Amino acid sequence: MHFQVILMMMWLWLEAEGGTCPTLYKRYSKHHTYCLHPNSTCKILTRGVSSGDKEIILREHNKLRSRVATGKETKYSLPKASDMMQLVWDDELASVAQKHADQCVFEHDCNDCRNVQNFGVGQNLHLRTSSAKFSDITWAGAVNGWYDEVKDFNKRQISGFIDGKGPPQTGHFTQAVWATSWRVGCGRSMFKDGNTFKDLYTCNYGPGGNMKNAIIYTKGKPCSGCPLNSCCGKACGGISYDGLCKMSGNTAPQYSPPKGFAFRCTFNGESDCATTTSGAKKWKTIKTLSGSFIGIVLNPGESSTLSFTVPFGVSDGSMCVESYYRKGPQVAGQVAAGNAVEKFGDPADPSFDYSTPLKESTDFMQFGVTLGWNTKTTLSVVFSVPPGTAPQYLEMKDISVRKGEC
């Protein structure tokens, strides 16, 4: 393999960069929240989250998530969860959340404005107001207030999230108990707005929840759907909670691979991931807290081809080739000019060539193509950037082949 492997430790890099706006954040949004200065029109009196606050935030979230997972939310008859993760603290999410709280605005920032490389990010907000300065901090009240939306929650959404905006509003509750969210980081600012004191609480979650049609949690025996590299409840030792899957260390959750694929590469060392490159040899495998992907950044006038050396095929009929990718300009707002193509070849016939282009998408997008043959086939990805444009990126993950149509 002719590409570099990078373990993503974004927060350490951010600390080294100090107050600058990281390149990746510039890619996600022209107005990434981390890159904003505090709002100069409001007078911030206190800000930040203490170590004691962190303990309260984690305790309150996990106590409530455990209540759902173990079937103890009997008042509203919620079923048990088999895959509810235990939340742990994330400094990068907290850093971005604090920058949001420093804006003194009780409104969500845009999804791209809070994204980090490890995952897409969800968000919950809480605001309290008073004519007098607050003398206490109410993280427990904020978290429990989000959870209290359970009273209006429609259980049918557990198997397919539809909408949390309401009325009545339930999106804070669904994000707080979204099973696959397992990292959280929060920020707080108390400020004066005219004659009113305001206290703004922001929590960011990764991977983010409230995805339309996605499962909020899987119904079943608690912990029966935990990641392979996690432990469950009291068996974990330390601070743990009944019915919650607990991760340790900075590694992505791993699950048993699904069966029935003729080819699958998730860029985690599988034999199907063997590749060669031609042109610009800049492909890098990035390991994040939500899995691995391969990516490249090309300057204007450059091109590169990534070729998978393991051919694939099925016994008869057609086959479906699926992949997830995202591509666009290295700086948000610049013109998207990268040309990406998936090329399919026949090892026995070098003259055979079938290609299909990849459209623009700044979020990972599922792409499937049905091949109307079953003979051995190879896959290459060709990426190029025309001269006179701006640098462009392409990232791909989870490439698979199965029998039948897409």
Curated annotation (Swiss-Prot):
Subcellular location: Secreted
Keywords annotated in UniProt: Disulfide bond, Glycoprotein, Secreted, Signal
Domain called SCP: residue spans: 58-205
Signal peptide extent: 1-18
One GO location term (cellular component): extracellular region
SUPFAM superfamilies: PR-1-like
Residues bearing attached sugar chains per UniProt: N39
Superkingdom of origin: Eukaryota
Record carries keyword Ribosomal protein: no
UniProt-listed PROSITE patterns: CRISP_2
Matches recorded under InterPro entries: Allrgn_V5/Tpx1_CS, CAP_dom, CAP_sf, CRISP-related, V5_allergen-like
UniProt family annotation: Belongs to the CRISP family.
Name of the protein this chain belongs to: CRISP/Allergen/PR-1
Phylogenetic lineage: Eukaryota, Metazoa, Ecdysozoa, Arthropoda, Chelicerata
